[in-house]
């Protein structure tokens, strides 16, 4: 057993992402699985987290009460749903725990609650924890600065049939990266649906298209299209483990932070490129 630098609690431990996070925590140098949680009434309560995730017995028992494990972790890793994440945020703020938030679908009030909590605790909040996706966001900023003023920009994303929000948080982050590079607000230039007689494409807009099908882990493409040529920047994920590893890497990075709101570009040092 390697020496732990950070102890993590994983909420939603029985879900697809939760199990991957448990596997990643058990494998990553410097990380210790301190707690695993599921909703009250879940049939998984009382199970060993490692056995649930297929990595063998860990001695960490899945529980529903966050307060009962507050001394067992330093950073909470949350890939659940907005209402649950905000409740966990209030707990972590009260008890001085760091957070890694991969939940998507927050409204403006939820995002504001995260910003306010970050004045007291350290939070990494990202739409996508894949290293590749965050490199892509940096590439999109650079492409937008060169081509954004004269091309038609479209973002196409595809996910599995169980995803409940659209467009994906990553697609929105792509739009925000492009809009920011063009000194625009995404709210003012995004087009989220087209149906019926729409008229010609409005110049300067950023279009979004969504696919939900099968077991697609996540595919995102940004298109910069002109007459005679187009540039497409694409990322395809084939395993959730890429997100889990990025989230645990973020938890390790938080060990030296007392407070503040960060994203994966901070963790990876991409803003200096």
Curated annotation (Swiss-Prot):
GO molecular function, one term: oxidoreductase activity, acting on CH or CH2 groups, NAD or NADP as acceptor
Location within or outside the cell: Cytoplasm
Disulfide topology: none
Pfam family, any one: DapB_C
Gene Ontology biological-process entries: diaminopimelate biosynthetic process; lysine biosynthetic process via diaminopimelate
Residues annotated for NAD(+) binding in this entry: 12-17, 38, 102-104, 126-129
GO CC, any one term: cytosol
Enzyme class: oxidoreductase
Protein name: 4-hydroxy-tetrahydrodipicolinate reductase
